[in-house]
Amino acid sequence: MSNLPVIIGFGGINASGRTSSHHGYRRLVLDHLDTQSRLDTLTDLATLTNKATFYNGLFYLAGEAQGLTQTQLTAQLGDQVKDATLIRPIRTEAYDVEKLVLNKVAQIVPASGDYTCIRMRKRHLPNQLPDNWQVSQIDGDTVEVTISGAFTAILPDTKRAPVSAAGQLPDGFDPSSLYQSRNHPRNLQMTVFGASDALSSTGIAWQILQDHVAPDRIAVYASNSIGQLDEAGFGGLLKNPSTGKRITSKQMPLGYGQMPADFVNAYLLGSVGAVGSALGACATFLYNLRNAVEDIKSGRRDLVIVGGSDAPITPEVMEGFRTMGALAEDHELCALDGGNEADLRRTSRPFSTNCGFTMGEASQWIVLTSDTLALALGAQIHGAVAGVFVNADGHKKSISAPGIGNYVTLAKAAALTESILGAESLRHRSCVQAHGTSTPQNRITESHVINETAKAFGIKDWKVAAVKAYLGHSQGTAGGDQLAVSLGLWRYGILPGIASIDHVASDVHDSHLAIQAAHHEVGTEGIDTVLLNSKGFGGNNASAVLMGPHVANRLMVKKHGFKAMENMRSAQETHNQAANDYDLQSMRGLSNPTYKFGHNVLTGEDLLINRHQIVIPGYAKAIDLSVSNPFEDMC
């Protein structure tokens, strides 16, 4: 019997705010929401960014004694929190764009004579003295160095960064302050927050989820595309020796790209189930989603946590992408607009006249189960993932240039949609969440992929969205951003337009596409499927078929029957209320992420092992050792 992978929880954080309860999505369509939804999201941003606290029924601004109602709070802070989100100027908390470190190597020669004399602390002397140095003691801590002839020095220097905008997490939000972060890289701090948000959004305690399945039928598939490259991870590991700092014992292990999965297992779930971390550049999230979907469809797993977390807004990473010609530079934006000052809120312009992508950061997570487990739990159904297709590009010249693999993945995704729901649904009730990076190359190549697929399947005016216009490009987690926004479509009926553009570029292939700045008003059941599209450096292409909750429920009724689905409604209402309670606590700034350091650490002595099973303390079900012979016909 088939297994449908359904989404029972989702959460995270990016430039639009908290993901659960659709708050991040709401930020993109804020002016089109009902009053209460708009107030709730602005309130959530106010407390998330530490601009307000909640006490005894009222909100308080920092340093003020007068309590405010929710309406009063949002009236005062609404514009501030909107300005503190989405793509905007890089804040000094990340780094100072006016003082980007770029030290200079200089050859120093004596101004007169053959020698240069300098004084320094003795402990600052290099271990290996140059041959032309003579050192004499001045006092207990000071030495004089006489240098014969020229010597080389690295002089501290800075310059203004050519790129000064990014899709950062909301200003004032500090994930390290929410738990004992112990000098964790920013990426992993975001992981703890994002995965906790997703788990809490289910409205079901993890212990209950865990008790429904055997330990080995759980999995966590998560990673990022470039590892942890800030000071606390690989960034510090690589540059500390050359800047006079020591390498710490944490920088090496905490820099690995699979650490988001490791942290979730070790500090949130205590899971001993399957674990994996696929890497596929900008398609990384969908690669991990594919592993989860295939596991559930095949019956190998019942419950999978899928996620990604990328924090690439560091001076070195930004400069690396800039020198590739990939990022939108300030002077290029000025040239596009014919002005002297770059519009740092509109740096990302997918499918319009553009000059490069804008960096973003994000942590996105979903809780995926089989339809059978979701039914048994009475879980909320937010959507379903019918399949994820992955293909390479074939032979290349430049390793970073796009190739033909994306034609294969998107065509397969369209074909699967048609096979499940029919040609009419594909043609009239599907849309595409494009990779949409805002580079000149992407606007041509990806639009051609989507347009040719539309032609092949008889689709006219295929709606195309591109959330990087709002959020920037969060690298390996970008597919998670696309998925999270798509789930909001089925709650509020609005597919976000590409609001940063005022025209579609003349070289975009759009004869069969609908690309526009305005939002698409489609209704909560007007779209059956969203095709998520990702393209990554090196030839990493992935396309996923995401189906709406109304479609997932219809398929589940067909399999389990109407009565079984009706019987789960009571449990769904309970879990929905628990999720709403969590959302309310979060909006008030009263919830903290899960972080269980040193909790219930087991050793081999704690296990009960016999020929038939392994019993693990804390799990209601044992691991079954009745393994069938997969090569019976050969034995």
Locations of regions flagged by a protein language model:
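Short loop-beta-helix segment that forms the pyridoxal 5′-phosphate
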Residues: 274-279
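Short conserved active-site loop signatures built around small residues
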Residues: 285
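Active-site histidine-anchored catalytic micro-motif
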Residues: 288
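Active-site signature of alpha/beta-hydrolase-fold catalytic machinery across serine-
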Residues: 291
